[in-house]
Amino acid sequence: MSSPTSTSPKSSFVFSPTSFPHAAIASNNVRPRTNLPPPPPPDRIPPPKGRSHQQKFKILRKEKDKDRRQPIDLEDDWTIEDVTVNGDGVEQESQYLDDLQPEENELKPGPRFLEMANREEKKEKTSKSRGLVKKTSRLFGRDKDKDRGKPEEPAVTGSSSSTLAAMRQSSSTSTDSTTSRSITSAFTRQNSIQSRRSPRTSFGQAHSRRASQDSQMSWPAPRSIRSSTTSHDPSSDPQNSASSTGVPIPQRQGASMSSLSRYSLPHPNGGTSRSPDTFPNKMSTWFSHLLPVSSGSPPSSSYETSSSIRKQSSVAASLFNAARQKAVDGVRHLLDSEAQPDKCMDTIWVRGVAHPGWRPITPENSTSNLPALEPGGSGGGVEDRRASLSMNGPSPNSLRPSSWKRNTSLPPTGQPQSPAHVHTQASNQTTSPSKGFTGIWNPSTLSLGMPIGGSPNKEKENGSGAESPSKKKSKEIVKWPEQFYDDFKSTVWFTYRNQYAPISSLSPNLLIPSPEAYYASFGPPLDATSPSSLRVTTPTAAAQQSASGSGGWGWSKEERGLTSDAGWGCMLRTGQSLLVNALIHIHLGRDWRVPSTPASFSEATTTQEIAALKDYAKYAQMLSWFLDDPSPLCPFSVHRMALIGKELGKEVGEWFGPSTAAGALKTLANSFAPCGVAVATATDSIIYKSDVYTASNLPSDDWNSISPTFNSSKKKRRGDNEAKEEKWGKRAVLILVGVRLGLDGVNPIYYDSIKALFTFPQSVGIAGGRPSSSYYFVGSQANHLFYLDPHLTRPAIPLQIPPLPVHSAKEKGSTESSSIMSTAEEESEEGVMIRTPETPRSTTPSMFSAPEHVEDEDQEEWGQGSKYKLDVVDADGVEVEGIDDDKGRNEGKMIREEVPKSSFESNGAAQEQPKKQKGFTSTASIDSQVDSQVDPHMLWYTTAYPDPLLRTYHCEKIKKMPLSGLDPSMLLGFVCKDEDDFEDFVERVAQLPKKIFTVQDEMPSWEEDDDAGLESVSEPDFEGDEFEEPGTAKPRFDSSSPVNEDSLKGPRVVSASTTATPLAAKEEDHLDVEEANSTDDDNESIGTTTAAGPMDIARHLNRVDLSSKREQEGDDDDGEWVGGTPSSQGVLVEPPSLKGTPSKSRSSAFEPRYEQNGETEQERPVFPARNRMESWVEPVCEGKEAPNGDNLL
């Protein structure tokens, strides 16, 4: 058989003597086989000489033809490089090439040439899937190597890929033609093997690098071992590579590479987009869904800095930024991030006040009003910063899309921005992806609504200045409406605080606000003769004493306690927010807004400025009540709320629920009369009108004993107790309603009702609404709620001890200054300073005085006497003396004269004693218009706390969340000023779409029979420690004598009606009950109401002839509980030998055992009492007792 020729379809070699001088080598190898028969089966032929060997060369030939047809697909020659396959690596290949050179020179075949073919045959057995994985890994490795080797080379836009492909094709064609004329098919096989084993710098490598460079526009690839071919990298130079490998390289290689200089890049155009057929493009499109930009995006962020260290994290930063950009809208609602101004035109309701929604506003045709030039804004500096951080030389403007033109806007002055200004502006802008993870969490990117970088569309939504100047002229600025924003900022916002005094236990007389402790905590009164004393800049000595922990508030520096409520006090803070905004609503009005700059003492000249100054003083005083200090001057501090919650079952440091917070607010507000607001809570989501009216009429007897203003106003209503419950009192009422509107989330049927609550003029917001946390919701718009987040920790503001308030008394019959319920027109008469020295008097602060006529007794009592009604003394040493009506009324002495002198000292100077102050006269007067209308005590509050500190109680960043993210457990707050306001509230509740709570007249009541019967059945147990030792009981009295009150130390007997008693004993028992009621009216009632005395029960038992039975049956029967079964009367019997402190849950019932002889009693052994229920269910023996206590016989 003749040797194969080029015409044979199955031949892998083409031997042409004219083209390849080494053809004799192949002919010598084939000549021994010329006389053989046709080739045997493949399994009988060795691999180097078999059919598979021919198929291998056929595959190489096909690949060569394929390379000629598709030169741009030469990426295969680098996809299996630098990988050890079957033990062959780069070092072995270099040794193999050295051994191959003599064979080429000698032009004769050798064993190594055959071994080479054998190795190639083994390599072909790798699977296609494994090759694809290798190709993918080499793709990333090659591009990463290019980034390190040439950091200063600019990126190539996608529009230039087709041009590069054409250049690669032309270079490949010319190179192939040269190779076909200079090397044989055997050399072609050798080069193909080399391309898979060692790095080569042939045209395939150069073009593959360019192809990978095209893919850099959409993602920065990692670095591999291969370095890019540049003029600055001598190791990758074509000539050096050729000399090192010994492989001839065409001269057109250098020309093709020089044509790809970054200074000769083709201009992009819309018709030359990247071809998706190339392999690198196919690889990049696999990850296109994770990338923030498309083919028309700006240059890659990997070239924005020349640092190769920072580029390593740019891939993860880009992916993170892309995911963040796409999910920012959803994450903003899920995580309750700060809301961005939107274009919702629906009405905004904030605590009963309607504000218009967004309205389009077009700015003037000037760049000075655009967000790009606003300091600290998010627009205008994005492109400038990108230019300053980009590569060394600026890229041509034609390479930048029209939507990404550099912002060349000038400042309003018309002067170009200095580099320092550009750098400062860039530092305030959003960071780029090249910053990596180190720049993601800087202050300018903490907002999830602000992107790290990305497409122009995202920056356009966020107000950046990346558009062309023509688009900037018609751009609309999206911001919150001014009216809504001012109202939102004026809402008081309490957050976590730290660095305050430890929360430790307080004595009972200091835990609940009391007038003695409150007024005793004030500092020395202001001297009316010294206007400079109104300006307080440093804490007084009492304030320092309070801060040091050596005061008399039950805690000291050595005690340990929580000094921060971070993590557990969010419900307390939102509860405080409800109360303080209710106080502002009542005292300052719903239309009050926090001033941008508070009025100064010296600048207030007009009537409006004076009114604003007084309002600001009231505002500062109310905030001081909520400061974090255990002083009695802070009745609503977190200390007292936490300790009250402890009394309600929650330990300090444990998260409070809405019901616990409502209970703490109710206890503190109802005990502090000067606030002018009482709290009424709903029961099982039901508001009872009787509870609301009772709260408005809460007595202030303790405060009346100190304040003559309250005393005079209350005296007129002391005899009108019945009308007191039916008419509205002098206090406003804060109604707190705890509701739960679902299981895991709010039921959507209640959405409209929740939104309607913010339209009530009585609304003060909602506290709670988050799982295991609490927000303060203040408004609604469409299906979203505006809220204040208390989960922000700030340092506590120290308390400044105010001076003792003073007040002047006008002539007899004159009206006093306005009260806590006064309106704006009544406030003008408030706070006249002392000008009549013969009638100085002290009351609560002037804003809390009642507009009532002073009675004659009060004028005589307070018209003459000491300068101050209450001197500054220690709270523990206050003793009030009663004033006799027959004498001493003119002296008006309320405090004992043995007051420590130190309590009157101020700055080292001692005040005069009350007796010496009796004839005190003031000759000084203040001519200022402000001083004549504003109380100096109130002016003290205008300077006591700096405005920056009070600003921490207001939030300027609006947050918004959807209704779907609301937690079903929440606390609703409504404040009613008067009866008309309350009736309007009731009507609005009845019109809610879905009833989430109701209003009823009064709580239903049940008869005592049912209560007593239920008590005796459900709670039959008692504590054994309530008994005293046998033999210590006091003697009983005869049944004919009335019960002595001194002989009873514990709860009295509880008895119900005698419906189950025998008919023969009903009349006598009824008389016994009346007799007991007549004798026990003055006894203290603990637990259930008393209806019968202890001896009455014994007389009743004697009448039914049970005494003889007891003596016969033994002592066990004596201890049985008479009554208490479902079908009998509820009779609870107790011994008089109970301890002085009864059980708090209920009065334990049992009967002592005595043996009576005549008028004296002999003590019998005391045995534990038994429940009467036991005898009824399991009778001990027949014929003993019936369940109602009667004899069964």
UniProtKB/Swiss-Prot annotation:
GO terms for molecular function: cysteine-type endopeptidase activity; protein-phosphatidylethanolamide deconjugating activity. SUPFAM superfamilies: Cysteine proteinases. InterPro entries: Papain-like_cys_pep_sf, Peptidase_C54, Peptidase_C54_cat. Its main location: cytoplasm. One of its GO terms (cellular component) is nucleus. Residues 1004-1029, 1070-1084 have a biased composition (Acidic residues). Residues 23-284, 358-474, 807-869, 899-924, 1000-1171 are annotated as: Disordered. Its EC number is 3.4.22.-. The keyword Ion transport does not apply. It comes from the Eukaryota. It comes from Cryptococcus neoformans var. neoformans serotype D (strain JEC21 / ATCC MYA-565). Keywords: Autophagy, Cytoplasm, Hydrolase, Nucleus, Protease, Protein transport, Thiol protease, Transport. It is an enzyme of class 3 (hydrolase). It catalyses: [protein]-C-terminal L-amino acid-glycyl-phosphatidylethanolamide + H2O = [protein]-C-terminal L-amino acid-glycine + a 1,2-diacyl-sn-glycero-3-phosphoethanolamine. Residues 35-49 have a biased composition (Pro residues). Belongs to the peptidase C54 family. Pfam families: Peptidase_C54 (PF03416). This is Cysteine protease ATG4. Cysteine protease that plays a key role in cytoplasm to vacuole transport (Cvt) and autophagy by mediating both proteolytic activation and delipidation of ATG8. Required for selective autophagic degradation of the nucleus (nucleophagy) as well as for mitophagy which contributes to regulate mitochondrial quantity and quality by eliminating the mitochondria to a basal level to fulfill cellular energy requirements and preventing excess ROS production. The protease activity is required for proteolytic activation of ATG8: cleaves the C-terminal amino acid of ATG8 to reveal a C-terminal glycine.
